[in-house]
Curated annotation (Swiss-Prot):
The gene is RAB2A. This is Ras-related protein Rab-2-A. GO terms for molecular function: GTP binding; GTPase activity. PROSITE patterns: RAB. GO terms for biological process: protein transport; vesicle-mediated transport. GTP binds at residues 13-21, 61-65, 119-122, 149-151.
Length: 209
């Protein structure tokens, strides 16, 4: 299928926060409760629509283990967007965000759009990180923020699409040189009369049970 633009994403965060589950829910619309630990990098892709233009998202899901951090770092280069994920029921995954963000800022292009995702909001009764804390961290570091649930699919679509919307706006504002593919953006072509796949510019929001 043709596309107007291709955006490359990377999903980062600690082991077990649900990175692979978020990707699977977005690309296949299904939840797999038992998922093998990601070894190295996994890959997914999906078409969405932004401003009536078909956009292809290529998404790299990275391993959270420290031993794979050097592999992960190589994927920062050439990514237009990142989903930085923590688990709202595990405080330590939130505490490690600063380290992940430092890594991303050091190895990625300066204009990469980063979406902070507090995953597993369906388990709000086991919450260890408040919504306000996530929101404050995002505000302090210039990130977009959303809580989501890979299990119920709440805000999963929105997290990926809203990130794409921010990247698209940067293209419109002239922030990116789209002829330089190191920014994680590739200009495609569109067959007349063809629109994109599922998805559209969606409104963000909190996570409701």
């Amino acid at each position: 299928m043709s596309y107007a633009y291709l955006f490359k994403y990377i999903i980062i965060g600690d082991t077990g926060v649900g990175k692979s589950c978020l990707l699977l829910q977005f690309t296949d619309k299904r939840f797999q409760p038992v998922h093998d630990l990601t070894i190295g990098v996994e890959f997914g892709a999906r078409m969405i629509t932004i401003d009536n233009k078909p956009i292809k998202l290529q998404i790299w899901d990275t391993a959270g283990q420290e031993s794979f951090r050097s592999i992960t770092r190589s994927y920062y280069r050439g990514a237009a967007g990142a989903l930085l994920v923590y688990d709202i029921t595990r405080r330590e995954t939130f505490n490690h965000l600063a380290s992940w963000l430092e890594d991303a800022r050091q190895h990625a292009n300066a204009n990469m759009t980063i979406m902070l995702v507090g995953n597993k909001c369906d388990l709000s009764h086991r919450r260890a990180v408040s919504y306000e804390e996530g929101e404050q961290f995002a505000k302090e570091h210039g990130l977009i923020f959303m809580e989501a649930s890979a299990k119920t699919a709440q805000n999963v679509e929105e997290a990926f699409v809203k990130t794409a919307g921010a990247i698209y706006k940067k293209i419109q504002d002239g922030v990116f040189d789209v002829s330089n593919e190191s920014y994680g953006i590739k200009v495609g072509y569109v067959v007349p009369g063809q629109s994109g796949g599922a998805g559209s510019s969606s409104q963000g929001g909190g996570c409701c049970s």
